[in-house]
Amino acid sequence: MASAGAPAGSTGGEGQKVQTCERIVETDIPARLDALRWSGFHTRVVTALGITWILDGLEVTLAGTLSGALKQSPTLQFSNLDIGFASSAYLAGAVLGAIGFGWLTDRLGRKKLFFITLSLYLMATAATALSWNLASYALFRFLTGAGIGGEYTAINSTIQEMVPARYRGWTDLVINGSFWLGAAMGAVSAIVLLDTSFLSVDIGWRLAYLIGAVLGLIVFAMRLWIPESPRWLVIHGHPERAAAIAAEIEASARQPRASRAAKIKLRMRAFTPLREVVGSLFGSYRQRAMVGLVLMAAQAFFYNAIFFTYALVLTDFYGITSDHVGWYILPFAAGNFLGPVLLGRLFDSVGRRVMITVTYAVSGLLLAGSGYLFVIDVLSAQTQTMAWMIVFFFASAAASAAYLTVSETFPMEIRALAIAVFYAIGTGIGGVVGPALFGALIDTGSRQSLFLGYLLGAALMLFAAAVAWRYCVAAERRPLEAVARPLAQID
């Protein structure tokens, strides 16, 4: 293999040539990665990295199911407004963490960042268990959110760049849908730990937050063997390392190197200048940026507004005690997980544009319908939960597709930051405002007021469906470099 100082045109690893006087590499690594069959390597990568969504599901569910315990805690004694504020602090941390860590992920590499972000999450969620008042609780939730937000950018980027093209849609949807496995874990944990015959209220909620820290330690060990993204390495001046990793992946898949894989020429660079990032996001790719923003904002408001406050709806409107709320999240979580699993393959076969439009539109219509049944008071706690289960069967696939869209329709050099920007803006618009707004609506005690909030969420989803139908990119089964040409690519 040629070293970085080899003469122009020398070989820089199997399937690529490096012209180091101009720092140009001709490589077939992206095409080789996309041509692979699914293997144990891909399963291990998806498991070790995708577990981030399980952690987020655990955290968000605990925030919801523990709300009653936090109100009853002799130490904290939170109001509904306090709970809404703390939920918004978590989301605000996720927004800022996504932007900061997203920029670092594109600059320093995927692997470094998914250890840094996981470490922050571990420390912050453990610290949450030691909270002594609203300020400390909100601060630790903010830091936990920052770790999770950073995880989203680093992990989404890595998975997109490692998974073969024909599996990308379904894999991404299932990984995002695994959020709800974490939600189920959180619900069951809350059922056990909030049982006052077993533990006091003030001890139970603290132990619940330690579950995330323990799970995070296991994940940390699982990630130690995962390599850096070969795509990132090639562009950032490490073609030899990229070639070696690609060869190892092919060997683990027991698949010979593709003999006629398409090659692309890339001008290697240490980093992408910020002006080029901004120019690409809001110049060359401004239409895709608009689509990403609309999809992310709509699903964030729809999801976070309802999910962060569902426990309050059950306790305040249906009289469910806080120690029984966890049982109601289980069918809700099942619908949310099954949606991406059962609908996910259609995003690769029928196509992104049709399926994103359908899932967003159906979600909006179903929420409006179930909201009407809520306002006329014909639902019980059980039928309300079943209605949410049906609504979010489609909404979960829609939300997962929003992450899929922003992670595959922008160039490799800005992929993590693009995910971060649209996650941050979308969550800032839809997620931070949503829980606080719905918390205030629930505090009014008026079904009519809460129904207006549901209608707002439904309207946002229908608007997003219209935008998707008009502007979504047909990225199904296509290589990432064909969906969005790398900024470093030359003819």
What are these regions (language model features)?
Residues A2-D491:
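Transmembrane-helix signature of 12-pass secondary carriers
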